[in-house]
From Swiss-Prot:
The modification S-nitrosocysteine is found at C40, C346. The keyword Phosphoprotein applies. This is Pannexin-1. The chain crosses the membrane at residues 41-61, 107-127, 217-237, 278-298. Pfam families: Innexin (PF00876). The modification Phosphotyrosine is found at Y198. It comes from Mus musculus (Mouse). GO terms for biological process: ATP transport; calcium ion transport; cell-cell signaling; monoatomic anion transmembrane transport; positive regulation of interleukin-1 alpha production; positive regulation of interleukin-1 beta production; positive regulation of macrophage cytokine production; response to ATP.
Amino acid sequence: MAIAHLATEYVFSDFLLKEPTEPKFKGLRLELAVDKMVTCIAVGLPLLLISLAFAQEISIGTQISCFSPSSFSWRQAAFVDSYCWAAVQQKSSLQSESGNLPLWLHKFFPYILLLFAILLYLPALFWRFSAAPHLCSDLKFIMEELDKVYNRAIKAAKSARDLDLRDGPGPPGVTENVGQSLWEISESHFKYPIVEQYLKTKKNSSHLIMKYISCRLVTFVVILLACIYLSYYFSLSSLSDEFLCSIKSGVLKNDSTIPDRFQCKLIAVGIFQLLSLINLIVYALLIPVVVYTFFIPFRQKTDILKVYEILPTFDVLHFKSEGYNDLSLYNLFLEENISELKSYKCLKVLENIKSNGQGIDPMLLLTNLGMIKMDIIDGKIPTSLQTKGEDQGSQRVEFKDLDLSSEAAANNGEKNSRQRLLNPSC
């Protein structure tokens, strides 16, 4: 019965979906903070203004008010308002006091803002689907390798310390140069760090930086066009809120009881003028920020990798490049995800101690630090592995006991056979 119950549990466990393992770098930022700020403001502000415009339309009702004769019923007056609102984009039915002004801009003002919001979101969408997956995999590889370089340094420093302790105390001249002996570590621990070689290849690559510059260029052009449109709309909004409308068409064309023209006024123009001014001011302030994003990769910052100069054979001088390339962009994203890089925190502590201390060898300090756990679940051993290890340990103990008993039985058998050979009476 117990065997059947156990077999049933195994069968049902095979059908259960396994929970996905938790990734090590689960909070990687694949967009720079300044770019994310520009996208949120440039896209979110028009959407907010559109919601305010539609809220005003819902609260007021109609967007136009036409002066109808007192002889008109309320249905006839509503027909005049609806007809003139629908004929706003038709120049033949309208006549403005200021000339032929594009009155349709007032009618489609919220939708034009929505169009700008969509256009400004396209660069972020393009970056997310074309560049972010490749960037994410590269950042995970680089950060894992940086942690591995740090772990190898600790392992090498501890092995050198154990070697010195095993050899025993030496003469005074040797003890004075203990720091130097720790630096002279076997090249097998640090020979050709793969992360250093991989980062050097990014100096000659420009695929990622071209995508980044293209996205920033599209954002700049769209914001500039939006500023031109908003300034133009703000300048003409106060001149074109009133116009004359004719409804004589079809069966009403020869009706003498209907006036030739109706005086109409767009009610929402004042609100739209205020919204366009707010949007224009914010976009004008965003233009210098967008221009600044063009020059961010040109800074060539290597502050994060400079900390790793404490480790042997890790040379940051080879990472400094000129002009725009992928390496400058990778340095920026490493700086953006510095909170996920555990080895950087430890090496930063060593750098501060080394700068404040007097003649302290960082390799000696490495022996006091712990290694970074590179497990997927960050050092947490699954319970299944623990129970499996315990079962294997118990099996080893049982096998060991069996081996000992078999060896004892064999020894007893050999002893008895020797006694029979020595004693002829047996």
